[in-house]
Structures are given as structure tokens and as C-alpha cells.
Curated annotation (Swiss-Prot):
Keywords, ordered alphabetically: Cobalamin biosynthesis, Glutamine amidotransferase
Active site location: C329, H437
GO biological process, one term: cobalamin biosynthetic process
Taxonomy of the source species: Bacteria, Bacillati, Cyanobacteriota, Cyanophyceae, Synechococcales
The organism of origin for this protein: Synechococcus sp. (strain WH7803)
Function field: Catalyzes amidations at positions B, D, E, and G on adenosylcobyrinic A,C-diamide. NH(2) groups are provided by glutamine, and one molecule of ATP is hydrogenolyzed for each amidation.
PROSITE patterns hit by this protein: GATASE_COBBQ
Name of protein: Cobyric acid synthase
Family: Belongs to the CobB/CobQ family. CobQ subfamily.
Span of domain GATase cobBQ-type: 248-445
Keyword Ligase: no
GO MF term set: ABC-type vitamin B12 transporter activity; catalytic activity
Pathway given in the UniProt record: Cofactor biosynthesis; adenosylcobalamin biosynthesis
Length: 494
């Protein structure tokens, strides 16, 4: 089990690295995180919802993601409330103060069922577990579902990861170990220092001090590698990145309060000529080459924030003065004219009494929320941007409700339910949107979309002969595993 001294210590990527290293050694690694809290989600081939970080770990292990790898997913939706997903299916919502009372036993049952499924399907496999947050939140230890309760249940050997970039790494480690209960401390088999900058021999004295004062070996010092991967559950590190050398296009991405599935932007972040700039409500939109509105867990509430902050009006002016705007899932819904949420699923508190709200009005769409979630992988040929040869795209749907056009407009895809395109004003502005998460993963289509922006700027066109982003992601996982093998001694864990 990979534990961390805090959230954001690097557990998810270290778990992914461990999975890839074990795969290289001929083993069958099985990534597993009993409970995750994240709005960055993936849909498995069976239509089950799971955290994206466990999907990434599955790819690192050379496996197809499956929701049994993340049997409990909590999706925050504001006001201390989360949607509860068990084994890929939504089973209700819960307030934080009622979680232990109402959901602890069902959650533990779901975790054991997920373990049973993985172990039955892969009797030769080795479970590679990821903890959550810190394992020693003393006010939460009785409710722990995914850290040391699970480690004790499985008698797992644990690696404790600490992020030296944040500072205070010695206090992080010593404090965490001091708060472990006597029965838990023997589970810790090694320590790992993550995100070290500079020559590793500069940490030799610190390594000796830790081993002398804790009695636990430091199994490795991982170098700073955050340029390889966006952070798994936080935008903080992504936003701290400097401007790319050679960036020719700037794309403004709206940092919605209930932002979800920001991994949709990974392929654009990976483009060497593209600079992403995250814009929160209340911040100036500026003059980007395009605006992207990503998904939202609380679409109406976030739309209300765009309206009240003036950022929504700025996006409207940008599009009608010739700009390009693209929305994914909730972002596309916001681009429409009318949104109705009679059941209050998407933040009705910000809407009118009947759950209705006016959208940004850049696409002639009406969305009505309700019914079962759409959870499925899709593939379709595309009609826009118009160019030859015809391209196809793949991705997944993850949304509630139904959207339809109020007046004739162009379809983004051959399947008319997957997206729409409309002109904005008389200066060449265009708005487009899709329900397809992962659309930017499709290399040829992504390059074709970027080339529309490059034409506006008089820039040379990029080649559309670009592989699916999964190939680049796999190469990054290899580089991560290379560093892990170089800098970490795994033997005490195996």
C-alpha cells in the first residue's frame, strides 16, 4: 500500500509507477483504492463510474480499468454534500456529518466486494493499494475505509510518501509515525521522499537522520517529475507551471467552482505550442485564441457564478466579436439557451424557483436534467471542423439529462446527440460543444481543431498525423517507471 503524509504527496503517481514496474517484471499488478473523493472520473467498459487516477493506474498495469478497482467514489457537489458511487453506480447523496452513520457499513461491504471481484478474476495478481489523504487524521480514524483499516485487513506492506517540495518533510514523516497506533506502525515498511530538486546526495544527511530516528528505511528519493503528468486531483501544481517556450496559442480554460473531469484538458496541456491559462470567476478573460468551458459537477450553480461574476458576459462578448468557444459536457450545457433542473440535481439553489436558468446563449440548446446517468463509451465520425478526410472520435458520456436543439444548427458528430456547432455574431465567432469526454485525446481531431485557431492567427498548420493521447500517456508512464526503478529500492516491499 502506498500511503502519504498528506493529500497531494504523490500517492497516485507512485502507485502508477509501482504498477508499471511490476508489470515489467512479469507480475500481474492490480491497482486498488477502496475509497476516493474526486470529480475527475472515468467510465469503465461496463458503464461503471470510477476515479480517473485508478484508471491511470490500470493503464500503467497494462489492464483495462474496471470500477472494482475503486469501489467507493465520493463526488463532492458543494454544501458538504457528496454523491456516493458504489461499484460504479450512483447510490445516493450524503452530507459529511452523516457519512459514518449512513454509509460506513455499505462502503466497507462495497470495498470487500471489489477486492473479491479483482482477486477472483486474477488469482495470480498482486494488489497494489493506494491510501487517501493522510492515514492519521485522528478525528476520522474510526471512519477510515481506505488507509490502515484496509492495510490491516490485507496485511499489506506500506510505503509512506512525503512531498519535500512543500517543506517540513521531517515533521511530516515523524508526526505521521507518531500518530500511528501501536498495531499500525509495524505495517510501515519504508519511506519515500518525493519531488526532490537538485543532487540527491544533498539529502544523504537527512536520509540518515530519518532512518536513525524512525527505525524505518528510506527506500528512495524521487526527483521532481511533475512536468511529466498533470496532478491527479488538484490544479494547484498545474497552475504554478511557467509559460511554455514555443507556445503560439493561448487557450483560456474556465476554472469552475465545481470543475469536473479536468483530465479532458491533459492532451491540450501536452501540446508544445499550446499554453493553457486557467481563469476563475472574477478574473479577466483577456484575449485568448480560444475559450474552453470544461465539465461541472454542479452545472447550474457554476453557471450562476459565471453570470454573477461577469465572466459569462466576457465569454459572450468574446464569441460574438469573433472568438472560438468550446464546451465539454456541463460546459456545453452552459453554452445553451435554457437549462432546467426541476429535481435540483445540478445546484438548483443558484437557479430560479422552478430550477430553470438562462444559459450563455451561444448555442441554441435546451437541457433538462433528470433520469438515469448516461455512462457509456461512444465512437462517431465528425462533421466539424469541416475538412477532408473525415475523422472519427471516441470518448465517453458521463451526464444526467437530455439536450436538444431549439432551432436548426450543425451537428459536431454523425451522432446528432453528441454535440452541436453554431456561428456567433457577424465577425466569425463560433461556439461548439460535445458530451464526449476525452474528445481532445483524439490526436487528428485535436490538431484539426487547433489548426482552425492557427489559421486565424496566420500560423503554419500542424500535422494531423497525431496518435491517440493514450500513446503519449503510456510513454509518460514508462518515463515515470524508469525514474522509480532508478531511485527506489522495491525489495523490502515485495
Amino acid at each position: 500500500m502506498v500511503l502519504g503524509t498528506s493529500s497531494g504527496a504523490g500517492k497516485s503517481l507512485m502507485t502508477a509507477a509501482l504498477c508499471r514496474v511490476l508489470k515489467r517484471r512479469g507480475e500481474t499488478p492490480l491497482p486498488f483504492k477502496g475509497q476516493n473523493m474526486s470529480n475527475n472520473a472515468w467510465v469503465d467498459p461496463g458503464g461503471g463510474e470510477m476515479a480517473y487516477s485508478q484508471a491511470l493506474q490500470a493503464w500503467a498495469a497494462g489492464r483495462e480499468p474496471e470500477c472494482a478497482m475503486n469501489p467507493v467514489l465520493l463526488k463532492p457537489q458543494g454544501d458538504s454534500t457528496s454523491e456516493v458511487i458504489h461499484l460504479g453506480r450512483s447510490v445516493g447523496t450524503c452530507r459529511a456529518e452523516h457519512y459514518y452513520r449512513d454509509w460506513f457499513r455499505p462502503g466497507w461491504a462495497a470495498i470487500r466486494q471489489g477486492l473479491h471481484t479483482l482477486e477472483n478474476e486474477n488469482p495470480e495478481g498482486r494488489l497494489v493499494l493506494e491510501g487517501a489523504g493522510s492515514p492519521v487524521e485522528v478525528n476520522l480514524q474510526a471512519r477510515d475505509l481506505t488507509n490502515l483499516r484496509l492495510a490491516q485487513y490485507l496485511r499489506a506492506r506500506c510505503l509512506l510518501v512525503a512531498d519535500i517540495e512543500r517543506g517540513g518533510v521531517f515533521a511530516q514523516i515523524v508526526g505521521t509515525l507518531a500518530l500511528l497506533r501501536p498495531v499500525e506502525r509495524p505495517l510501515i515498511s519504508g519511506l519515500l521522499i518525493n519531488r526532490f530538486r537538485g543532487r540527491r546526495e544533498l539529502f544523504d544527511e537527512g536520509r540518515r537522520w530519518l532512518e536513525q530516528h524512525t527505525g524505518i528505511p528510506v527506500l528512495g528519493v524521487m526527483p521532481w517529475l511533475d512536468e511529466l503528468f498533470p496532478p491527479e486531483d488538484s490544479l494547484d501544481l498545474l497552475e504554478r507551471r511557467g509559460r511554455k517556450r514555443g507556445a503560439e496559442l493561448e487557450i483560456a480554460v474556465l476554472k469552475l467552482p465545481s470543475l469536473s473531469n479536468f483530465s479532458d484538458l491533459d492532451p491540450l496541456e501536452a501540446e508544445p505550442t499550446v499554453q493553457l491559462r486557467w481563469v476563475a470567476p472574477g478574473e479577466p478573460l483577456g484575449t485568448p485564441d480560444a475559450v474552453v468551458i470544461p465539465g461541472s459537477k454542479q452545472t447550474l450553480r457554476d453557471l450562476g457564478r459565471l453570470h454573477s461574476s461577469g465572466l459569462g458576459s466576457a465569454v459572450q462578448r468574446f464569441a460574438r466579436s469573433g472568438g472560438a468557444v468550446f464546451g465539454v459536457c456541463g460546459g456545453m450545457q452552459m453554452l445553451g439557451q435554457e437549462l432546467e433542473d426541476p429535481e435540483g440535481l445540478e445546484g438548483q439553489a443558484a437557479a430560479g424557483g422552478n430550477g430553470a436558468m438562462t444559459g450563455l446563449g451561444l448555442l441554441p440548446l435546451r437541457t433538462r436534467f433528470g433520469g438515469e446517468k448516461a455512462l457509456r463509451h461512444r465512437q462517431s465520425s465528425v462533421h466539424w471542423p469541416e475538412h477532408q478526410p473525415t475523422l472519427s472520435v471516441e470518448g465517453f458520456e458521463l451526464h444526467r439529462g437530455h439536450t436538444h436543439a431549439l432551432e436548426p444548427c450543425s451537428n459536431l458528430c454523425e451522432d446528432p446527440s453528441l454535440g452541436w456547432v453554431a456561428r456567433c455574431g457577424d465577425q466569425g465567432g463560433i461556439a461548439a460543444g460535445t458530451y464526449l469526454h476525452g474528445i481532445f485525446d483524439n490526436g487528428p481531431w485535436r490538431r484539426r481543431w487547433l489548426n482552425q485557431l492557427r489559421i486565424r492567427r496566420g500560423l503554419e498548420l500542424l500535422s494531423e498525423q497525431q496518435p491517440h493521447h493514450s500513446r503519449q500517456r503510456d510513454a509518460l508512464l514508462d518515463r515515470l517507471a524508469d525514474a522509480f526503478e532508478t531511485h527506489v529500492n522495491l525489495e523490502p516491499l515485495l
